[in-house]
Structures are given as C-alpha cells and as structure tokens.
C-alpha cells in the first residue's frame, strides 16, 4: 500500500469536497433548520420522552415567559444534590444510583446488597481476554481500545444479538461492571508498550465500590485515601446520566431503535463520547490551565489572568480556537449543578494533595471567564462553569492520567446509556429517522 500516493490524492480532493459540500448558512435559516437540533437559545428540539432524568435550566416568570434559573439535575425523581447529600460519610453512591437509574426506584438494603453481589460476579473478563484482545493491540486512544473490547466481548456471548429486554438488562449490567477493567487495563497496556513503563494487572476485589476498584487497579500499590475514593465516587455519580438528548445517549437510542444489539449500541455511544465536543472537554480545560500557568507568573493576579483569558477569546492564545474551555453549557445557563457539587469537594482534595494554589487559580478563572466572555461575545443566555471545568482538576489531583479522563466519563455514563437503552426497548415502535431536506441542484 502506497500511503504517500493515497495521502496526496486525499489532499487534492479536500478542496473538491469543500466546494461541493458547503451549504450556505442562509438556506438553514430559510428552511427553519435547527442546526445541531437546537434553537438559537440552545434549547434542544423535542424528539422523545423519558422518565430517567430531568434537567432544569429555565422556569416560568410572572408573565408566563421562560426565564433562566439555577440548574437542577434529577435522577428518577430525585435531585442529584439530595442523593449525594444523603450518603453517609463513608458510604459510596455509584452502585445505589446505578440501581435507581436502571430500574426506576431506590433499592432497599437487601436489593442493594443483591445488586452489589451481581456487579461483583460480573467483574471479570473471558479467559485470556486481557492478553489476547487488550494487550496485543494497545493504543494511546483508550476510547478506541475500549470500543474494540466491547465489540469483541460480543464474540464471547452466545446471545449477543438477542435484544430481548431480559437479555439486554443482563448485558448492560455486565458491561457496567467490566468498564473499569477495560479502561484501566487498556491504559496499562498502552503505558507499557508505548511508554516502556512497568506492566501490572490488578484484579478487582469483591466488596469494593466501583471508585475503589478503579483507583486500586490503576495504582501500582493499590492504595488510596478515603477522600480520594469518595471524591471519585461523587464524580462518577455526577457523570452517570444527563438526559436523552446528549450526543452519546441519543446515539444509544438511535442505534437501539434500529433493533441492533447492546454491544453495538454501546460501541456507537463510545464513538460519540470520544469526540472533543462531547467527552473530551475536561482534557482541554487542564491543557488550557497549564498553558495559563506558563504565561501568568502570579496565579493570584486577577488582572493578568483576565488579560490572558481575553487573548484566548481573541484567538491569540492557547489553541487559538477562541474558546474558554469549561465555560458555558448547551442546556444550563445560570449554573451547572454537577459543577456546584464537585466544587464543594475540590477544595478538600486540594488541601490533601497540597494543590491549593491550583485551586485558587481555578477559582479566579471561574469568576473572571464569564466577565471576559460577556465583554467580547454576543450571548443569548448566561455563562457559568460546567462540570468539565473542575473534573479535569479532580482527576489530575487523583493522579489519573489524561488518557483516562474520557474513559472514566464512559465508566459512569454507561449507566445512563443502559437506562435509556432499556427505556427505548420498552417503548420502541419506530426507528428514529429525522428529516433532511435536499438542496441539491439537479444536473441533466
């Protein structure tokens, strides 16, 4: 295969594609197309109904008009802030919340014990799977490695294409339990073969929470503090679910509506989540903040920090995209409740990790970025930090490598994907097929 020849042809054809595939923005306005399935205010086009979660970002004013309000996130009728607040000091919430999202009701004590036991039993991979699938084809792109593993797991399942509800529930539970292993083992394989680091495979232990197992499998000595495990558990809870309209969950429902199997639906969702506009934003926040540290000597100098942020917005700094990563959200306007919850734990972790200077810098950017954006952009709703703003800092303080940031997101979000797959299977009667209007010119 002559790659230079193929690359040269592709480069030549790029301009042809741009010429023939560019559609005038005016046509989208003419035909009333909501690009990205969202209106000018960022509100999504209504495409379905769900009982799994609810996002609140607007409320009715005195005149009946919708006005922005502090953001709220509800799981199966329960406010996420309440779910986290109700946890005991040494109690983990991932498993309890997963049960709630999957089955629509809080588990009793006996139901939770049974569910935790099922997850423990499912925390294993087929014989030699780690060696034959994960270790033999390592990749720096851990999301690709996990996606490949998910599709390969179908080969070990005699009922892989059976999309009946009972079988799909079983498959979803197994994948939820296996995702931490797929993520961590894929990273270790890459780190060994690409970075020439030591290779070690720690097995998950029964009785440990998902957060505890993740940290133990990742670290050479398997050690972690109670606060580290608690903060990671909270982060996982906050990332589990975010409505049916987010890109990866909608992808799950689209693929499910076609009658496809669980493994294919989850692999498709993974392909969506790995996109930098969806699951990769927290990495960009960390990179942006690292760049800021290099260009601003005094991390408490708010004037210098704001000047740097203005340079970013003018495309004169960082990646020259004009974006301050971690600011704003497609749905929330006044506040992102997930960011508020995570923020309440960040300061404690920063003290434990002796990273208080980093935390102060983040707080300054959190306060100054909305001001800078308001001064340079025409905005249709408020701008506030989203969950990605602090999640990257949390993972950095937990010594989780950047290659695992998005896979960790997936480890949580697969619970939401599974819940929506189940709901789609129960209520499915039509394949999802939105309309596209052709503006092609006929050539005789």
Regions found by a protein language model. Give the residues of each.
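Non-transmembrane, aqueous-exposed alpha-helical and coiled segments at domain scale
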Residues: 1-444
